[in-house]
């Protein structure tokens, strides 16, 4: 019985990892290049990837994408960005 449970668990894990890999192939690099990751230069919050990442210009002369201290508020602001996540 234990062997069957372990076998089924491995089978489910194999199918899950295959579907995740297929989802990654659906989004080309050009689509993910529309927004910047953490520490990427930015001009507005919409230039940064992720719902909790904001464009921070307070601590230096150049603006960079940083993790927001208020992720819920940032997610609401990001909802109004056009074609960027």
From Swiss-Prot:
The keyword Signal applies. It is found in: Secreted. One of its GO terms (molecular function) is toxin activity. GO terms for cellular component: extracellular region; host cell postsynaptic membrane. Residues 1-16 form the signal peptide. Disulfide bonds join 35-49, 42-55, 46-81, 48-65, 57-63. Coiled coil: none annotated. It comes from the Eukaryota. Residues 17-34, 82-85 form a propeptide. The keyword Secreted applies. Expressed by the venom gland. Keywords: Disulfide bond, Ion channel impairing toxin, Ionotropic glutamate receptor inhibitor, Knottin, Neurotoxin, Postsynaptic neurotoxin, Secreted, Signal, Toxin, Voltage-gated sodium channel impairing toxin. Its main location: secreted. Insecticidal neurotoxin that reversibly inhibits the N-methyl-D-aspartate (NMDA)-subtype of ionotropic glutamate receptor (GRIN) and inhibits inactivation of insect sodium channels (Nav). In vivo, is highly toxic to insects. Belongs to the neurotoxin 03 (Tx2) family. 05 subfamily. The presence of a 'disulfide through disulfide knot' structurally defines this protein as a knottin. This is U1-ctenitoxin-Pn1a. It comes from Phoneutria nigriventer.
């Amino acid at each position: 019985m234990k062997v069957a449970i372990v076998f089924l668990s491995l089978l489910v894990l194999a199918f899950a990892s295959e579907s995740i890999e297929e989802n990654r192939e659906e989004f080309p690099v050009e689509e993910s290049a529309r927004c910047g990751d953490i520490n990427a230069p930015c001009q507005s919050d919409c230039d940064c990837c992720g719902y909790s990442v904001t464009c921070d210009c307070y601590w230096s002369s150049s603006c960079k994408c940083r993790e927001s201290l208020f992720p819920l508020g940032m997610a609401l602001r990001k909802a109004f960005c056009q074609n960027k996540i």
